UniProtKB/Swiss-Prot annotation:
Gene Ontology terms for molecular function: GTP binding; phospholactate guanylyltransferase activity
Protein name: 2-phospho-L-lactate guanylyltransferase
HAMAP family for the chain: CofC
UniProt cross-references to InterPro entries, sorted A to Z: CofC, Nucleotide-diphossugar_trans
Subunit organization: Homodimer.
Keyword Nucleotide-binding on entry: yes
Length: 200
């Protein structure tokens, strides 16, 4: 099973722009990517543009839109796609995901997205963004494919906004992205009823 990790090097994690500079977001996104690659043996980074930092990583540059890039690979062979910001996944989670039966296997995100996707069908195609989980379910059903939903708390957390950073700081000790956030001053304040993300 070929595993791809889609990655966008330019202006990543724009929803964090109020609390992180562009340089910080670029470095953070790269650390997230490395966390994911730590869990996906032999994975290929599917980059939307060229980036010098990918030089020593197995990667392919595909400047087409995400759906075209992903679907073109699904048409060729059994493929899995793991988003590059799933900092909390582990090798065990990825193995369990890859071992799940089905023509199509989807790990949904907390906010309606598709965080991991596996296709053993040449017919399947993707429609990422804007509630992609339900769209992918409908596509699989329309094509008459056997669909499995992969239920994982850690796989459901993709790091996009401040609330996601809080989850990473609560659950991600030992991860590269966690250590980077700590190095630039982020921490969790437990002084109130609910934990809050703070920056020194």
């Amino acid at each position: 099973m070929k595993i791809y990790v889609p990655f966008k090097p330019t202006n990543p994690k724009s929803r964090l722009s109020k609390i992180m500079s562009e340089d910080e977001r670029r470095e953070f996104a790269f650390q997230l990517l490395l966390d994911v690659l730590d869990c996906c043996e032999e994975a290929v980074v599917l980059s939307a543009s060229r980036d010098e930092r990918l030089r020593d990583l197995k990667h392919e540059v595909d400047e087409r839109d995400l759906d075209t890039a992903v679907t073109s690979r699904i048409k060729k062979e059994d493929s899995a796609f793991v988003m590059s910001d799933l900092a909390l996944i582990s090798k065990k989670i990825v193995k369990k995901f890859l071992d799940t039966d089905g023509d199509v296997v989807i790990a949904p995100g907390r906010k309606g997205g598709t965080n991991m996707l596996l296709s053993r069908s040449r017919e399947f195609y993707t429609s990422y963004h804007y509630g992609s989980f339900l769209k992918h379910v409908r596509i699989a059903e329309k094509l008459g494919l056997n669909l499995s939903i992969f239920d994982s708390f850690y796989a459901s957390i993709d790091i996009d906004d401040e609330s996601d950073l809080l989850e990473l700081m609560l659950h991600g000790k030992g991860k590269r992205s966690y250590e980077y956030l700590e190095s630039i001053g982020f921490y969790v304040d437990f002084s109130e009823k609910e934990p809050k993300l703070k920056r020194a």
